[in-house]
Amino acid sequence: MGRKEITTKEDLMKVIELFENTGITYWLDGGWGVDILAGKQTRIHRDIDINFDAQHTEKLLNVLLNLGYKIDTDWKPVRIELYSDELGYLDIHPFVLNEDGTSKQADLEGGWYEFEKDYFGSVFFEGKTIPCISLKGQKVFHSGYELRDKAVSYTHLTLPTN
């Protein structure tokens, strides 16, 4: 049997609930992060991207492995991609959180990406307030490399003004 290659809105909401239950600080990122900023699903998503407090990496991995996820790609401390037959792909990114609200993420060359505090926020989606990367953060996170066709709209995203 093939792998689940699409994560649905229902999968997303289950993953959000899972993270809320861990008590670990997190933010939704990636394609689903853009979609909740837009207030609706705009395309099909292969995975769910979550940035989280790096000091809880082992705790989070234990929770996910106990729920049936298996590690698919291990690029610690940069990212870890996991797979669940039920919920599909989950790409987690450990962030070191600073007291002033800024953060940093390890890069593949042994350095760091530095992030401003206004890259992090929350949005109301499907009856819940969900921590997510802000529009400004999404634009910065998706700069510096060539976007896939389905992601080009990220840089043109504007939010409703209501």
Residue ranges of each PLM-predicted region?
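Short gly/ser-rich loop at a beta-strand->alpha-helix junction or flexible surface loop bordering the NTP-binding
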Residues: I24-A38, S134
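Phosphate-handling catalytic interfaces
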Residues: Y119-G137, H142
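Short amphipathic alpha-helices in soluble, non-transmembrane regions
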Residues: N62-N66
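Conserved catalytic core of two-metal-ion nucleotidyltransferases
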Residues: K70-G101
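Catalytic metal-binding acidic patch
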Residues: L37-L60
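Conserved small/polar residues in nucleotide/adenosyl-binding loops
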Residues: T155-T161
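Helical scaffold of the NTase/Pol beta-like nucleotidyltransferase catalytic core
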Residues: M1-L28
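Short, surface-exposed loop/helix-turn segments at secondary-structure junctions
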Residues: G101-W112
